[in-house]
């Protein structure tokens, strides 16, 4: 497993059990420096017996940028998961089943052929080019422009910010550059009566994968590594892991993966790769479970308010409640209760789900600092 600041908490076990066993330990002189030294790292806090102070007085008031490293570590962990044979085989079998149920049976063998040719390339390119720093920049957990010490200053991010608007990635492998374009001309039209809509096919398959990936289950799986960490540290680790993982999966699956796969591999345009959601694939908001009602309200209200002026936002938010026949009153109450926060968040928002996470009404609050601020700490 890759070295991880999040996972280094496991290395604190010898320190917690018997301080003399630690490879490096803080001296009494260093600990005498006070909070400035204690709270530089979790290791220092434990060695100086100041963990409670740092949790309550320093880390609990830290900015999201202080957690940048943990964010990057979880991206590394998720990327590592894609290298597992079982994971790749599960994705392949699922996509093969999706090919088999295509309504036009003439597309089935071609769909299978696309999987055979492109899936290994996509997985390999994803593993080698995804940049944790760029991903964490995208979700707002790392300051932009901050390079890792081992990163060459001239090296571009693998997933830079312009990816939000158009596909901009490093030089492609020759195998990918040699592949056909959106209509895959090497699959001759003479073999089929119609041109093959491979960008549509790509977009459909990607969204099908997104719909079935259990993000909550993955988040809990990532957090399992925290269970061997004792006492309060384990609770913080698990909380951070679960919240970060869902946030990162939202960012990766929602924007990065569709553009990476369909834009790079099939050279679909940005519009093709990120086109309108397919009704048969994208889950409808009305199908969400009852426990997500407030999250449902929030996303609908934000989507309604996006295309209005700041002056018209309150009215637009109330109008969004008209679609909820049975829960209109609850929706109105939600809008009234959260109106000040919504008016502040919506103008700066690019993603309704992330914004509602920041508001605390959708799963995985956008600020993992809540892990530090919970009452039991």
Swiss-Prot record:
Main location: secreted
UniProt-listed Pfam families: SapA, SapB_1, SapB_2
GO BP term (any one): respiratory gaseous exchange by respiratory system
Glycosylation sites: 307
Residues making up the signal peptide according to the UniProt record: 1-22
Keywords for this protein: Disulfide bond, Gaseous exchange, Glycoprotein, Repeat, Secreted, Signal, Surface film
Domain (Saposin B-type): residue spans on this chain: 64-146, 195-272, 291-366
InterPro entries: SAP_A, SapB_1, SapB_2, Saposin, Saposin-like, SaposinB_dom, Sphingo_Act-Surfact_Prot
Location of this chain's protein in the cell: Secreted, Extracellular space, Surface film
Residue ranges listed under propeptide: 23-191, 271-377
Domain (Saposin A-type): residue spans on this chain: 24-64
Alphabetical list of PROSITE patterns matching this protein: SAP_A, SAP_B
Disulfide bridge positions per record: 68-142, 71-136, 99-111, 199-268, 202-262, 226-237, 295-362, 298-356, 321-331
GO cellular component, one term: membrane
Role summary: Pulmonary surfactant-associated proteins promote alveolar stability by lowering the surface tension at the air-liquid interface in the peripheral air spaces. SP-B increases the collapse pressure of palmitic acid to nearly 70 millinewtons per meter.
Note: Pulmonary surfactant consists of 90% lipid and 10% protein. There are 4 surfactant-associated proteins: 2 collagenous, carbohydrate-binding glycoproteins (SP-A and SP-D) and 2 small hydrophobic proteins (SP-B and SP-C).
Subunit structure: Homodimer; disulfide-linked.
Protein name: Pulmonary surfactant-associated protein B
Organism expressing this protein natively: Mus musculus
